Each structure stands twice: as structure tokens, then as C-alpha cells.
């Protein structure tokens, strides 16, 4: 059963009074008074019972601070990465509030989490759009958040070149709304989900945290603007800030509870793993590799593929290590680049399907080679990627895809 948080208003059935006054005889007065007392007594009893019922008391757990319990707001928690982060937080005994407008996320993912953690005061879902400043402020007013993990964002490079204003609004503007609420309500920690796309196409590899940020597509530019706002605010704030710039995310929950389920209309913009799986399942006739003339070993793009389980582990470590009046900026990757052709071969082995591949011209806004140097996050947070076998990560994701051919609607 989902725990939805929303304002409720109930209208009263009323009828107009007559113009005259009725005179009640003493006996009738007594009967009416008795009924009133009975109604009041029953109402009081109902209120008492409701207040002590789990479904009624659970919202108050979210509205108050509790010693030993850290309450984390996960924006975009119904999405691919956000839902995996929420799962990890819940497993680690955090209290979690998910806020999502479901434009890219899946209510099915929230239902899975609710089924795994049904206890009152563990998880709540709030349907809201972060672009609605009043709604966001209300959420912060009614909940005692200790930290915010801000994942909510549109996140397709190709789509960003076609509809840049959507990206500046959804990423930059909405982050400002969240940041204002964080400041107004004095939330202690902010973990921001950023991207390697803020670096653009650097001259040198691997990418380190001080590599100049020169994004070349609206997605990367919008994310960098959001970073800049957070960094400027942090200069005069006691808030602890962690900015995680991560690379290409793959994989899914090793126990098969969650996976990636993009909206059908967005598949053409989606991750390469999703396209590979669609081709393996026969949803599309084959895989389209865009760009074979890059200055790389085999002519295709080179990327650093990070397993989602490792990624959320980095977020939890960042949350644990975040210190007041400090900012941490970290690359989250494996430190090893893999070409698209290598990725496709790994996907063929993982699925057992000889996927048909068509090679097409480059996609606007893409860059040739991007991979990380994760030395800083290892040194500061004692984090390193564990799931680095590309084929094994794809095998785990493929198992979920096979059992969920229609995403969470298959459950």
C-alpha cells in the first residue's frame, strides 16, 4: 500500500435554515442533547482510534526529527538511478521520502520499494513537480529532512539538443527551486547528481575533478549551471555539499527487484544498454551505432560504464562523509574506457543473441572519448567500483529485462 502525502479538503453537506425558529419541548430537547453527546463521543473515539492506527501515525514520523534516524529526500526517486538509491538507503535503515512527477519515473518502482519496506515511517511517496515552488516549499514545511539527494532531471544528450529549453527549465530552474527550499528550511546536507557531460570533450584523458568544464550540449550546460548555483550558495552556508559527476550508468539491482524501464516514447534517446536489450528481445530490428569516425581505437565512442549498484554506493558514502561548511566534488567511474563496439560485443554475449548492428552518422552533441580518474573519491571516501565486468553487469540487467518485457507493468 502506497503512502501518498497530499492536502485533503472535504466539503460539508449543508442545507439552508428556514426563516423561523422552532420551539422544542423539554422532552425533545433532552432527546436531541442525548444524540449530540453520543455523536461527540463516537467522533472522539474515532479520532483516537485513527491517531493510533499505523496509516495515520506514519506521516508524523516523517514530519519530526528522530534521534538515530536520518530522513533523506530523494528527488526523482521513481526513476532508474533514484529508485536504486532509495532501495539502498532503505536497506541501510534510512527514512526515505520520494518526490517525483512520474514524467520519466515509474510508480511501479515505488510500489516495489513499498512492498519491501511496508513498516510505518520508513518510506513515503509524494507526487509533485519540482517546478512548482509552492508545492516544494509545502513538502519541506511538512517533513523534517536531514538530507536531500537530488536526482530528478531529464537526462538524454540527444533530446537536449532538440529541446534545450526543456533541459534548462527541468535541470537548472528546478534545482534552484530545490536549493531555495533547502536553504529556507535549513537542511543539513545536499548530494547533487551531476554528470561527466559538464566536462565536454577535454583535451586530456582521464578526466580529473579539476579538468576544465566546457560542456558542448544543453544537458551538460544545464547541469553545470546547477552546479554553479549550488557552489555559489555554499560559500555562505553551513550546509554540507557533495557533487557527484558520474559517467555512463548500466546494470540493475543484483537481486532483480528493480531495473531500467524508460517510457516507450523516449527509447530512441535512451542508454545504449536499453537499445541493445530492445534489439535482443526483437522490439527493434537491430542496434544503431551512431558514429564510426571518431579518433578512437575502433572509430566508435569510448565511455566509462559504471554499474548502478556501485553508483548508489558512492552516494551513500558521500552522504556519510559530508561535513558542514564543506564541498566535495567527485568523479564516479571505473577509470577504464570501453568503446561502443566493445559494449555491443559484451551485450551479445550477455543476452546470447547475435544482435544486428547498423552503423550510422554521428549524433549531434556527442564526444569521442570520456573516462574518469576515480583516485580522489577513493582517497577521500574510500570508494571504488566493484562491479567492473561489463558483461556481468549486462547479464544482471538482462535478467530483469527478460522478466519485465513491459517494464514495471509486467510485475
Swiss-Prot record:
One of its GO terms (cellular component) is Golgi cisterna membrane. It is a single-pass type II membrane protein. GO terms for biological process: capsule polysaccharide biosynthetic process; galactose metabolic process; UDP-L-arabinose biosynthetic process. Its cofactor is NAD(+). Residues 1-13 have a biased composition (Polar residues). CDD domains: UDP_G4E_1_SDR_e. It is found in: Golgi apparatus, Golgi stack membrane. The active site is at residue 219. Pathway: Nucleotide-sugar biosynthesis; UDP-L-arabinose biosynthesis; UDP-L-arabinose from UDP-alpha-D-xylose: step 1/1; Cell wall biogenesis; cell wall polysaccharide biosynthesis. It comes from the Eukaryota. Its main location: Golgi. Its EC number is 5.1.3.5. GO terms for molecular function: UDP-arabinose 4-epimerase activity; UDP-glucose 4-epimerase activity. The chain crosses the membrane at residues 32-50. Residues 1-31 are cytoplasmic. Residues 1-22 are annotated as: Disordered. The keyword Metal-binding does not apply. It catalyses: UDP-beta-L-arabinopyranose = UDP-alpha-D-xylose. It is an enzyme of class 5 (isomerase). Residues 51-411 are lumenal. Pfam families: GDP_Man_Dehyd (PF16363). Belongs to the NAD(P)-dependent epimerase/dehydratase family. This is Probable UDP-arabinose 4-epimerase 3. It comes from Arabidopsis thaliana. The lineage of its organism: Eukaryota, Viridiplantae, Streptophyta, Embryophyta, Tracheophyta.
Amino acid at each position: 500500500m502506497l503512502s501518498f502525502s497530499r492536502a485533503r479538503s472535504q466539503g460539508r453537506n449543508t442545507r439552508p435554515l428556514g426563516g423561523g425558529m422552532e420551539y422544542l419541548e423539554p422532552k425533545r430537547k433532552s432527546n436531541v442533547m442525548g444524540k449530540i453527546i453520543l455523536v461527540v463521543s463516537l467522533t472522539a473515539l474515532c479520532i483516537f482510534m485513527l491517531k493510533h492506527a499505523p496509516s495515520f501515525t506514519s506521516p508524523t514520523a516523517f514530519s519530526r526529527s528522530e534521534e538515530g534516524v536520518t530522513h533523506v529526500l530523494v528527488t526523482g526517486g521513481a526513476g532508474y538511478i533514484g529508485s536504486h538509491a532509495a532501495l539502498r538507503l532503505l536497506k541501510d535503515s534510512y527514512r526515505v521520502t520520494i518526490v517525483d512527477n512520474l514524467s520519466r519515473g515509474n510508480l511501479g518502482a515505488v510500489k516495489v520499494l513499498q512492498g519491501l519496506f511496508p513498516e510505518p515511517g520508513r518510506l513515503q511517496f509524494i507526487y509533485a513537480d519540482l517546478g512548482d515552488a509552492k508545492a516544494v516549499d509545502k513538502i519541506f514545511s511538512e517533513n523534517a529532512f536531514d538530507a536531500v539527494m537530488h536526482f530528478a532531471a531529464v537526462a538524454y544528450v540527444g533530446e537536449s539538443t532538440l529541446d534545450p529549453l526543456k533541459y534548462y527549465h527541468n535541470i537548472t530552474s528546478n534545482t534552484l527551486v530545490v536549493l531555495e527550499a533547502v536553504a529556507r528550511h535549513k537542511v543539513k546536507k545536499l548530494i547533487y547528481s551531476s554528470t561527466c557531460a559538464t566536462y565536454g570533450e577535454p583535451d586530456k584523458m582521464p578526466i580529473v575533478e579539476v579538468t576544465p568544464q566546457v560542456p558542448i550540449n544543453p544537458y551538460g550546460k544545464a547541469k553545470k549551471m546547477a552546479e554553479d548555483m549550488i557552489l555559489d550558495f555554499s560559500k555562505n552556508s553551513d550546509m554540507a555539499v557533495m557533487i557527484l559527476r558520474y559517467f555512463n550508468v548500466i546494470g540493475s539491482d543484483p537481486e532483480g527487484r528493480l531495473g531500467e524501464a524508460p517510457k516507450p516514447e523516449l527509447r530512441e534517446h535512451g542508454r545504449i544498454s536499453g537499445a541493445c536489450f530492445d534489439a535482443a528481445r526483437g522490439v527493434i530490428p537491430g542496434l544503431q551505432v551512431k558514429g564510426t569516425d571518431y579518433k578512437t581505437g575502433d572509430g566508435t565512442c569510448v565511455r566509462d560504464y559504471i554499474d548502478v549498484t556501485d553508483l548508489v554506493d558512492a552516494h551513500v558514502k558521500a552522504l556519510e562523509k559530508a561535513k558542514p561548511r564543506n564541498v566535495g566534488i567527485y568523479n564516479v567511474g571505473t577509470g577504464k574506457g570501453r568503446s561502443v563496439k566493445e559494449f555491443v560485443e559484451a551485450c551479445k554475449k550477455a543476452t546470447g543473441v547475435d544482435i544486428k548492428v547498423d552503423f550510422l552518422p554521428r549524433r549531434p552533441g556527442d564526444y569521442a572519448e570520456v573516462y574518469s580518474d576515480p583516485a580522489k573519491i577513493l582517497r577521500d571516501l574510500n570508494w571504488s567500483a566493484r562491479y567492473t565486468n561489463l558483461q556481468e553487469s549486462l547479464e544482471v540487467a538482462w535478467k530483469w529485462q527478460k522478466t519485465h518485457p513491459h517494464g514495471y507493468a509486467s510485475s
